UniProtKB/Swiss-Prot annotation:
Origin species: Drosophila grimshawi
Gene that produces this protein: dbo
Record InterPro entries: BACK, BTB-kelch_protein, BTB/POZ_dom, Gal_Oxase/kelch_b-propeller, Kelch-typ_b-propeller, Kelch_1, SKP1/BTB/POZ_sf
Residue span, BTB domain: 73-140
Comp. bias (Gly residues): 29-38
Name of the protein: Kelch-like protein diablo
Length: 624
C-alpha cells in the first residue's frame, strides 16, 4: 500500500612591555602589534565587557550556605514554634512586606527577633527557602497554606504559581472549593477561571457534594449567570431543589431568593405545571407561587411577552452550544472499518449511527451544507475514489456524489467558499500533489493548481479565506513544510514550516490559530503539538497531549479542541482528550466505542430541540 496509514511504516599579542627599562606601552603598540618586524595586528579593544551568567546562582548559593550555618544572619523569624534565621537585606529584596517592615519606622525594624502571626510555619520556611534558592515545589499538600502566606508576604510570583497549580487541578468535584479559595485570597484570575469552569461543567458540578454545601450567596452567584451551560432550565431547577432538600430546615427560608434566579418562563409548560407548580415547598411559599404565576402568564400570553422581558426570560448563552462530533471509519483490529459514531459533549456520550456503505481508512471528512462527506480512503484491499454523504436528519448515507478524479487515501479534505477540496494523498502508485474541488450544485469535481510538494497523510485547514496544507509525507520522509492556497489567484505559496516533521497529524482552526498535533516523524509517533499564527507567520509549541497519537482526528466542538483516537506506537486508541487554552493543558474525557487509526472527524450542529435523538441505526422523533 505504498505508505499506508499503518504503524511501522582570545589571546594577547606577543609583543613585550618595556616599562622596566623606562619605555612606555601605548594602545596599539606592544600589546596590540606583537612587536616590531611582524605584520601589524588590529588594535586591541580598549574595553572588554563581561556579564557572568553564573554569578547570580553562585551568589544565592553562598548566601543560602551562610543562612544554613547561621552566619551574618541579622534577624530571626518566630513562626509558630519555629525559629527561622535570615538576612534582612535578602528578605527585603524579595518581599515588599519585609521591605516595609525593615526599612520603615516600625518597631520590627530595630528588633533582632520578629514574630510573624497568622501564617503556617512550613509555608513560611518554603517561602524563605525560595528567597534564597529561587526554587519551590507547589503540590496538593501545601498549596492551601502557601497561597495565603505568599499573599501576606506579597510574593507575587509564588501567588501566580499557586494559582496556576490550582487551575490545573480544576475538576467538577473541586471547582467550587477552588473558586471560594480564590475569592477569599483575592486571586482574580483564578476566580475567573474557576467561574468559567463551573459554568461550563455545571451539569457535573451540580452532582458534587461541594454544590450541596454551597452557601446561599454563592449558589445565587452561579445560577444567575447567562453563561451557565445547561441543556434546559429544568436542570437549574432540579439543581436548586437538590441543594434545598439537602438541608430543608435551614434552607427553605431562602427558596424564593434562589428561585427568582431560575428562569421559570423558559421551562416547558408540562414541567412548569407538573413539577414546579406541584412541589409542596414551592406551593407553600407565596413569593414562589408568584414566580410560577409570572412564568405561566409568559407562556400563555405570547402577545404580551415583549412587555414582560427581563432577566428571567433571557435565554442562557453558553458558547456555541449544540454541536456534535462524528468519528468516521478508520483502521481497527487489523482492518478498515465502516462504522461511524457521534459524540455529544453535553452528555459526554458516544452513540453509534448508520455505518458507511464501504470500509474506509485514511478517509477525508468534512461538513458542507450540513451534510457530512467521506472522501476516498482505503477499504483494506483497494484505493478508493468514491464519496459518501451523510444526512443527520435521516441518519442515512448516500452514494450519489461524483467520485474524485483520482483514487486517494491519506487525503486532506476541507471546505472553502462553498467548495469541498481534496488535497494530496496517495493513489497506490505514487504520492500526490493533485488538488481538486467539488461543486455540490453541479455534483462535479474539477482540478485546481497542484501543491508545490507531494503530500500523503497531509492535514488541511481553512483560515481567513486560504487553504493550508500542513506536513504529511512526500513518499520518502515526513515533512514540516506548509503551503497556502489562494483561490482567487489559484496559486500555492510556502509559509513558515512547523518545528517538527509530521505525517498523519491532526489539524484544526481554533481561536484564529491553526493547531497541529501528533502524527509521526522519522522514527516514532508524536504527542507534541504546536500552533500557527497567520498574523506573524510563526509556529509556537503548546503542551503535549497525554498520549502519542498518529492518525489522530482533531476538531473544535462547542468552542473546545478535541483530539480523537490514533495510534500510540503499540495500540490503536479509542480515547479522546480535550485542550484548554486557558491552562495550556490536555485532559482525557472519554472513549469511543471503536479504536480508530486514520479515521476522519467532522463537526455538525445538533437538532435544535431535544425531541430528536440518534440511536444505533435509526432516527426517532419523540413527542415530549
Amino acid at each position: 500500500m505504498g505508505d499506508p496509514l499503518l504503524p511501522g511504516s582570545t589571546g594577547l599579542g606577543s609583543g613585550s612591555a618595556t616599562a622596566a627599562t623606562g619605555g612606555s606601552v601605548t594602545a596599539g603598540s606592544g600589546l596590540g602589534n606583537g612587536g616590531t618586524g611582524g605584520a601589524e595586528r588590529p588594535p586591541s579593544p580598549a574595553r572588554l565587557t563581561h556579564t557572568s551568567e553564573k554569578h547570580p546562582k553562585v551568589t544565592l548559593t553562598e548566601l543560602n550556605m551562610l543562612r544554613r550555618h547561621r552566619e551574618l544572619c541579622d534577624v530571626v523569624l518566630n513562626v509558630g514554634g519555629r525559629k527561622i534565621f535570615a538576612h534582612r537585606v535578602i528578605l527585603s529584596a524579595c518581599s515588599s512586606y519585609f521591605c516595609a517592615m525593615f526599612t520603615g519606622e516600625l518597631e520590627e525594624s530595630r528588633q533582632t527577633e520578629v514574630t510573624i502571626r497568622d501564617i503556617d510555619e512550613n509555608a513560611m520556611e518554603l517561602l524563605i527557602d525560595f528567597c534564597y534558592t529561587a526554587h519551590i515545589i507547589v503540590e496538593e499538600s501545601n498549596v492551601q497554606t502557601l497561597l495565603p502566606a505568599a499573599c501576606l508576604l506579597q510574593l507575587v510570583e509564588i501567588q501566580d504559581i499557586c494559582c496556576e497549580f490550582l487551575k490545573r487541578q480544576l475538576d467538577p468535584t473541586n471547582c467550587l472549593g477552588i473558586r471560594a479559595f480564590a475569592d477569599t485570597h483575592s486571586c482574580r484570575e483564578l476566580l475567573r477561571i474557576a467561574d468559567k469552569f463551573t459554568q461550563h461543567n455545571f451539569q457535573e458540578v451540580m452532582e458534587s457534594e461541594e454544590f450541596l454545601l454551597l452557601p446561599v450567596g454563592q449558589l445565587v452567584d452561579i445560577i444567575c449567570s447567562d453563561e451557565l451551560n445547561v441543556r434546559s432550565e429544568e436542570q437549574v431547577f432540579n439543581a436548586v431543589m437538590s441543594w434545598l432538600k439537602y438541608n430543608v430546615a435551614d434552607r427553605r427560608q431562602h427558596l424564593a431568593q434562589v428561585l427568582q434566579h431560575v428562569r421559570l418562563p423558559l421551562l416547558s409548560p408540562k414541567f412548569l405545571v407538573g413539577t414546579v407548580g406541584s412541589d409542596l415547598l414551592v406551593r407553600s411559599d407565596e413569593a414562589c407561587r408568584d414566580l410560577v404565576d409570572e412564568a405561566k402568564n409568559y407562556l400563555l400570553l405570547p402577545q404580551e411577552r415583549p412587555l414582560m422581558q427581563g432577566p428571567r426570560t433571557r435565554p442562557r448563552k453558553p458558547t456555541r452550544r449544540g454541536e456534535v462530533l462524528f468519528a468516521v471509519g478508520g483502521w481497527c483490529s487489523g482492518d478498515a472499518i465502516a462504522s461511524v459514531e457521534r459524540f455529544d459533549p453535553q452528555t459526554n456520550d458516544w452513540k453509534m449511527v448508520a455505518p458507511m456503505s464501504k470500509r474506509r481508512c485514511g478517509v477525508g471528512v468534512a461538513v458542507l451544507n450540513d451534510l457530512l462527506y467521506a472522501v476516498g480512503g482505503h477499504d483494506g484491499q483497494s484505493y478508493l475514489n468514491s464519496i459518501e454523504r451523510y444526512d443527520p436528519q435521516t441518519n442515512q448515507w448516500s452514494c450519489d456524489v461524483a467520485p474524485t478524479t483520482s483514487c486517494r487515501t491519506s487525503v486532506g479534505v476541507a471546505v472553502l467558499d462553498g467548495f469541498l477540496y481534496a488535497v494530496g494523498g496517495q493513489d497506490g502508485v505514487q504520492c500526490l500533489n493533485h488538488v481538486e474541488r467539488y461543486d455540490p450544485k453541479e455534483n462535479k469535481w474539477s482540478k485546481v493548481a497542484p501543491m508545490t510538494t507531494r503530500r500523503l497523510g497531509v492535514a488541511v485547514a481553512v483560515l481567513s479565506g486560504h487553504l493550508y496544507a500542513i506536513g504529511g509525507s512526500d513518499g520518502q520522509c515526513p515533512l514540516n513544510t506548509v503551503e497556502r492556497y489562494d483561490p482567487r489567484q489559484n496559486k500555492w505559496v510556502a509559509v513558515n514550516p512547523m518545528s517538527t516533521r509530521r505525517k498523519h497529524l491532526g489539524c484544526a482552526v481554533f481561536n484564529n490559530y491553526i493547531y497541529a498535533v501528533g502524527g509521526r516523524d522519522d522514527c516514532m509517533e508524536l504527542s507534541s503539538a504546536e500552533r500557527y499564527n497567520p498574523l506573524t507567520n510563526t509556529w509556537s509549541p503548546i503542551v503535549a497531549m497525554t498520549s502519542r497519537r498518529s492518525g489522530v482526528g482533531l476538531a473544535v466542538v462547542n468552542g473546545q479542541l478535541y483530539a480523537v483516537g490514533g495510534f500510540d506506537g503499540s495500540a490503536y486508541l479509542k480515547t479522546i482528550e480535550v485542550y484548554d487554552p486557558e491552562t495550556n493543558q490536555w485532559r482525557l474525557c472519554g472513549c469511543m466505542n471503536y479504536r480508530r487509526l486514520g479515521g476522519g472527524v467532522g463537526v455538525m450542529r445538533a437538532p435544535q430541540t431535544e425531541n430528536y435523538m440518534w440511536c444505533d441505526n435509526s432516527f426517532r422523533q419523540h413527542n415530549l
